[in-house]
Amino acid sequence: MVAITAGNASVRFTGFFSESKSMSDSFNTRKQFTAGDRSFDFFSLKALEEQHPSVATLPYAQKILLENLLRHEDGSNVSKSDIEALANWDAKAEPDTEIAFTPARVVLQDFTGVPAVVDLAAMRDAMANLGGSPDKINPLSPAELVIDHSVMVDEYGSSGAFDLNAKLEFNRNKERYAFLRWGQGAFDNFKVVPPDTGIVHQVNLEFLARVVFGNEQTNLAYPDTLVGTDSHTTMINGVGVLGWGVGGIEAEAAMLGQPITMLIPQVVGFKLSGKLAEGCTATDLVLTVTEMLRNKGVVGKFVEFFGDGLADLPLADRATIANMAPEYGATCGIFPVDGETIRYMELTARPKEQCQLVEAYAKAQGMWREDGQPDAQYSDVMELDMSTVQPSLAGPKRPQDRVLLSDMQKTYQREVKSFVKDRQDKDDKSMAEAREEGEGGTPSKSVGGSAPVKYRDAEFNLQDGSVVIAAITSCTNTSNPA
């Protein structure tokens, strides 16, 4: 914390630029391990296990939190008693102990990221006005902003649509993009992924995720963790990275090195066995999982997937399930690191040294998943044999409302009656039109149960129940060919 005074004005900056901070190691857990031909320091959970044997049975997600506390123990934000509380976690107890979690990085999208960069720029102006060095104002945690939310589709259905949309996008957002480009050059620890690269969660999963950080300056290895400014940030849980969505203010605080306070969460274990039947996709699986977890009630809890079924679950499918955590109500839906994680990292062209680091670290920490290993202690356990999953659809209104494909006809016949009734409700229609006219709107002509459509040289009617293919971009399946 530094206070700068100019005349009668004074501003106190906390956590906006690096200062030496004394860290403790009350349990003497800082050890070394080897990855390839390199050696790293790390805070060993196995060393802590010698003093607190219950660490061995902690869920994967709790081990990530525990390592985070060990690494950030300072006697203030993180105390020895905080570490002991998590090391001796009672899986069945109601959460009542607050801890300080410090994410390793922050992921932003452009709508929420631009205000954050504006705030940093304003802090630099304030620092300069008070006679200080504005260059000292930087994010302490790596912040990565992916431009995707401002993308609009003006042209479609043609081979030149992508190039035209990209050109229009750059022209439309020229000032914003120029500002972000300036920010990337001006601030340390701040990177911008340009538009037309992909949806933020896809970019995070396929390019940005380290899974394990190897800090060259401190020679310290530690898990990749994050918070993001989008509810579906949880997609990154599929690759074994703990992270979830937060608001813009929380994200800015994390960028500036401030921990996020949270109660030690309950962890619901979701045991997967078997494998998907021929003709079933990850979408069918995720709709089934979402329905089960919504019925169970997992709000405010972590969900952790485990079991030998993971051996037959590709990482793209894991990411699809993890992405839907907001829909089933959990804070996160995480998968442990295993051989499939490494295979995916190799598939997405991660360096060989990074893959070696991730595998060696996970094994050294007792966080590597293998078939047949003992189950962790969970607050509750649910089970699903994936061979029982059937082709499904979502809706008609909410993604957690699952409909079996075999039941689609009768479900449609039931649901369409309520839609028709709503459409024929004259009183409600009159009230809506009166309200719209009062607010300056003009009521449109009702199309009834059908609407004429002209596409290129063809003309036809769309009716209730027509089957159409819509160009809907869904982040849930972005990184999944299924």
Residue spans of the language-model regions?
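Glycine-centered signal
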Residues: I4, G15-F17
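Compositionally biased low-complexity segments, especially N-terminal hydrophobic helices
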Residues: M1-G7
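Fe-S-dependent hydro-lyases/dehydratases of central metabolism
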Residues: F17-A482
